[in-house]
Swiss-Prot record:
Residues 107-131, 180-189, 349-360, 427-429 are extracellular. The lineage of its organism: Eukaryota, Metazoa, Chordata, Craniata, Vertebrata. Residues 1-85, 153-158, 211-327, 382-403, 453-492 are cytoplasmic. It is a multi-pass membrane protein. This is Progressive ankylosis protein homolog. One of its GO terms (cellular component) is plasma membrane. Pfam families: ANKH. InterPro entries: ANKH (IPR009887). The keyword GTP-binding does not apply. Belongs to the ANKH family. One of its GO terms (biological process) is regulation of bone mineralization. Disulfide bonds: none annotated. Regulates intra- and extracellular levels of inorganic pyrophosphate (PPi), probably functioning as PPi transporter. Its main location: membrane.
């Protein structure tokens, strides 16, 4: 009789990952709800969707790096003093982001970035800059939320983090429904998704901060003891954070770059506006079945026994590295299955777009091919997430920086080359994104192999030194040998 392996060690992983996965999917649902708030507007729905999509993707460029401060909270924050340093970093970053939002909205720089580079008309450009100004405070609220989310994850409160994100989405959906029946639909329809986004962000931030104060604040020391390396410095936090922030910034800037090249490829025509609208609609739907795989990178820092912080948070940890690898593979298989069921089963993807976002069926049919390309994203995303988590545990994130550069190079190369092969519109955008993901994951794998070999070589050297020390310890000292000789002589 074949004995099945015990599933007991996998339950902590499941309890940890499921709320995070739901969180990621909930964020995508929130984006779809916001898009529905635009699509439901009777007049100029495609133009409004394109304007909001451009502004939102640019805003995500600023919020992206801040969301990676979650990992700083997960790895570094062991005391109240560490938390204050992390919060201070995010306050400064939020202020800088708000200044950039204002500059882009009011200066010639914004006119050049949005109108000239994207080749959009005055109407779309004006609405995009206005929406971008309205979104100026979102990066700051996002930063506060993610910092406390990381601290909660360190102490295994992933359920609370998931609840906060679901509450965010529920608030967005409710307020979109309410505002669609207000005078805003006629006077300023752009404010419908933007105000709903603010309400949701406020709910999430408040939930996470209250959760921190209720469950963790009184339990952690004022400062970190020497057994976990003492207090983390701002320099250490930023050194750990900047490669992750660079990677996420390049991921988030990828969408604006894609919008830019797709729009320019079609010459700023009506077809270009339609293509950007298709990308705006397909991003959250395509991202939903695989986006949660990114959360796998939080598993290693939370569960690996070599991480001193995780030892404090979970002393009786039954999860081994093999369990983490097996669970990662299972997550990838599940994501691939979801992608192919949702995007390759006839009429399923169209129904999602029509029922959830509220677009018409003809527009939904134009989204089918881009969505099918999203089916291949789970493989590179899983590889990247798993290896990034391992490198975070070792605090070797600096080796990840080249992967972000390669991603942008591959992305732009694809956006330039593919039109010569007859690929245009939203298909060009999503196909180039896939190429960028593959390039980035390949570089992460190479960086991980480099670190692994260095770690192995270092371990072998240490073992050799310990072996020599042990051999020397086993031999009697010179004084002991002399005593033995003297005893023998007396005996004779």
């Amino acid at each position: 009789m074949v004995k099945l392996p015990s599933l007991t060690p996998y339950w902590p992983l499941i309890r940890f990952l499921v709320p995070l996965g739901i969180t990621n999917i909930a964020i995508d649902f929130g984006e779809q709800a916001l898009n529905r708030g635009i699509a439901a507007v009777k007049e100029d729905a495609i133009e409004m969707l394109a304007s909001y999509g451009l502004a939102y993707s640019l805003m995500k460029f600023f919020t992206g790096p801040m969301s990676d401060f979650k990992n700083v909270g997960l790895v570094f924050v062991n005391s109240k003093r560490d938390r204050m340093k992390a919060v201070l970093c995010m306050v400064v970053a939020g202020i800088i982001a708000a200044v950039f939002h204002t500059l882009i909205a009011y200066s010639d720089l914004g006119y050049y970035i949005i109108n000239k580079l994207h080749h959009v008309d005055e109407s779309v450009g004006g609405k995009t800059r206005k929406a971008f100004l309205y979104l100026a405070a979102v990066p700051f609220m996002d930063a506060m939320a993610w910092t406390h989310a990381g601290i909660l994850l360190k102490h295994k409160y992933s359920f609370l983090v998931g609840c906060a994100s679901i509450s965010d989405v529920i608030a967005q959906v409710v307020f979109v429904a309410i505002l669609l029946h207000s005078h805003l639909e006629c006077r300023e329809p752009l404010l419908i998704p933007i105000l709903s986004l603010y309400i949701g962000a406020l709910v999430r931030c408040t939930t996470l901060c209250l959760g921190y104060y209720k469950n963790i604040h009184d339990k952690i020391p004022e400062s970190s003891g020497p057994e976990i390396g003492g207090d983390a410095t701002i320099k250490k936090m930023l050194s750990f954070w900047w490669p992750l922030a660079l990677i996420l910034a390049t991921q988030r800037i990828s969408r604006p770059i894609v919008n830019l090249f797709v729009s320019r490829d079609l010459g700023g025509s009506t077809a270009a506006t339609e293509a950007v609208a298709i990308l705006t609609a397909t991003y959250p739907v395509g991202h939903m079945p695989y986006g949660w795989l990114t959360e796998i990178r939080a598993v290693y820092p939370a569960f690996d026994k070599s991480n001193p912080g995780s030892k404090l948070a979970n002393s009786s940890n039954p999860v081994s590295k093999t369990h983490i690898k097996n669970x990662t593979f299972a997550c990838m298989a599940l994501s691939l299955t979801l992608c192919f069921v949702m995007f390759w089963t006839p009429n399923v993807s169209e129904k999602i777009l029509v029922d959830i976002i509220g677009v018409d069926f003809a527009f939904a049919e134009l989204c089918v091919i881009p969505l099918r390309i999203f089916s291949f994203f789970p493989v590179p995303v899983t590889v990247r997430a798993h290896l990034t988590g391992w490198l975070m545990t070792l605090k070797k994130t600096f080796v990840l920086a080249p992967s972000s550069i390669l991603r942008i190079i591959v992305l732009i190369s694809s956006l330039i080359v593919l039109p010569y092969l007859g690929v245009h519109g939203a298909t060009l955008g999503v196909g180039s994104l896939l190429a960028g993901f593959v390039g980035e994951s390949t570089m992460v794998a190479i960086a991980s192999l480099y670190v692994y070999r260095k770690q192995k070589k270092k371990s072998e050297t240490e073992n050799a030194v310990e072996g020599e020390d042990s051999a020397m310890t086993d031999l009697p000292h010179n004084e002991e040998l002399t005593d033995i000789v003297e005893i023998k002589e007396d005996g004779e």
